[in-house]
Amino acid sequence: MSIGITACRKIEDYRQAIQHVGGEVRVLDPSMGMVDALEGIGGLLLTGGGDVSPSRYGEPTHESVVDVDEQRDEFEWALIAEARRRDLPILAICRGIQALNVACGGTLVQDIPTQVPGALEHSFKVPPHERYSLAHEMWLDKDTLLEKLMRERLSDSDSCDVNSRHHQAVKVVAPGFQVSATAPDGVIEAIEDPSSRFCLGVQWHPENFWRTGEFRPLFEGLLEAAQSVTKKP
């Protein structure tokens, strides 16, 4: 089963995370037409990268906003719209959760350090070999898709530790979505659409743990949902 992964600079861990649960990878980039991009894939993985343009959610640009790629935004907005129209499974990671939320009608905190009073450090700058270093705790909401996927790996307090490399976050949650995890400072760590086959966005980087498997259930869940697409009569 092929999973479409949006092109980004650091794609290898995403690729490995999908392949290690038995999936095949197809890299999607803005040079593709929409028909070609989605042809033959059973699910979509939205990857990390630069900031989403604030113009997408009707706000002036904060001075901290960096690496905006209008072409990528345009491509991913079209991907998200078509994937949701088809009810293709979606897993959105870091920038991906932000793109998913904004494309579906939500907004973002443009800069956590200056816009979230009392915020934890979320934008850890680490060398490649430390991308799996755990940064802070998060709490999962009960009876959500995320909690069900991670249930066997959670502590008794329904919490787990995650890595963290972001300065933006979901602010207003898109209509139809719900929060499924938060950091102790209230920053949203995951959202999902309970009406979809599988539509989950996470703010941390679970793909960095493909060797050790802490977040393997997220990728297994995506692949299982993608396989159900092809079995649909």
PLM-predicted stretches and their roles:
Residues I97:
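The feature captures the ABC ATPase H-loop/switch
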Residues M1-L91, N101-V109, P113-D161, H167, ...:
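N-terminal beta1-alpha1 cap of cysteine-dependent amidohydrolase-like domains
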Residues L200-V202:
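Residue-level marker for buried hydrophobic side chains located in beta-strands
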Residues C94:
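Conserved G/P- and acidic residue-centered "switch" motifs that form tight phosphate/ATP-binding loops
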